[in-house]
Amino acid sequence: MTAILITGYRSFEIGIFDHKDPRVSIIKQAIRKDLIGYLENGVDWFIFTGNLGFEQWALEVANELKEEYPLQIATIFLFETHGDKWNEKNQEVLSQFRAVDFVKYYFPNYEQPTQFSQYYQFLLEKTEGAYVFYDTENETNLKYFLKKAKDMPYYQLLLLTFDRLNDMSQS
């Protein structure tokens, strides 16, 4: 079994507030290309954390690819309360994250800051690599996860950057 964590920018972090934004289709084209590459190299599990934005779009693509490839999808939420306060539209997205092959809640609820570090360590230990939409020119809290991932021997990272997206949009 080979599992890849998929995570990246939330939609608001890159200024996308509408699913019909033309940038979403370019991002999804890149996702499709990269996920097919993973599948053709033996990956059989895609792991999500349940965030809006990149993960949401990657989940949509992964569900489409299930028609062509034997893949499994899991969502490992940080807390059971993840998304509870989201609006109705976002609750629909949350239900898609819960309608996958495997769902786990790492903690019942928030108690202390160290839970975040423990959660990311768990994700790193349970996956062989990560596909991350992230660019060092636009830093977020993902930088802490990436630092841990880069410190792990044999952990494979594939970054989708703004430069890669620009190249794809021009071709």
Swiss-Prot record:
InterPro entries noted in UniProt: YspA
Gene3D superfamilies from the UniProt entry: 3.40.50.450
HAMAP family cross-referenced by the UniProt entry: UPF0398 (MF_01575)
Family according to the record: Belongs to the UPF0398 family.
Protein name: UPF0398 protein SpyM3_1388
